[in-house]
Regions:
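N-terminal accessory beta-strand-rich subdomains and adjacent acidic, glycine-rich linkers
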Residues: 1-181
């Protein structure tokens, strides 16, 4: 475990034989907003992955903003990274097959922070992160009026109050699937 201090924030890093993880830690006092977070997972475009797309109507406008409200339920698609549908968001966890290794990408410790979606905007081997902006207006709706439906969003992803730690970004590494558990 290592912590790299940058003053107002630090990065905690962990590396083990079975994987790696990192998270940001804020030392800021008072209220502040997180505008965005950037992470990229780079692989060969020919590497294959098991990915769960967000449910998406093929006739809908290819807009990530409409895909942030999801049930996080879908079957996994096995595809080369270069063939990932750039119009669709992917939710974690995913498994990337690289050479003789399997890499499980996920997150943990989500509290008052949006979940991480992945995309392949450029049709290459880079998986980009996407985060839903914080809801501004939420109205009751959906099936049997049981859901909070986001009607508008802020231009930032999180509101924070004082020092805190942020979600872990995790990559587990194994040769066979059972080693990823």
């Amino acid at each position: 475990c290592a912590v790299v201090d940058f003053g107002d924030y630090s990065v905690e890093l962990r590396a083990y034989m079975e994987g790696v993880a990192y998270r940001f830690i804020s030392n800021i006092e008072g209220d502040y907003k997180i505008v965005d977070e950037l992470a990229e997972f780079s692989f060969s475009e020919d590497d294959k992955a098991w990915i769960p797309y967000v449910n998406f109507r093929p006739d809908a406008t290819p807009d990530y903003a409409t895909q942030f409200e999801t049930s996080f339920e879908n079957t996994y698609t096995h595809t080369a990274l270069k063939d990932i549908d750039w119009r669709r968001l992917i939710f974690a966890p995913i498994v990337v097959e690289r050479n003789d290794l399997k890499l499980w990408i996920s997150e943990s410790n989500l509290e008052d922070y949006p979940g991480m979606f992945l995309s392949n905007r450029d049709g290459d081997g880079v998986l980009d992160t996407e985060f839903a902006p914080r809801p501004k207006v939420v109205e009751q709706g959906g099936y049997n009026m049981l859901q909070g439906m986001v009607k508008s969003r802020h231009d930032y992803i999180a509101e924070c109050h004082g020092s805190r730690s942020f979600p872990w970004r995790v990559v587990a590494i194994g040769e066979v699937d059972c080693e990823l558990a």
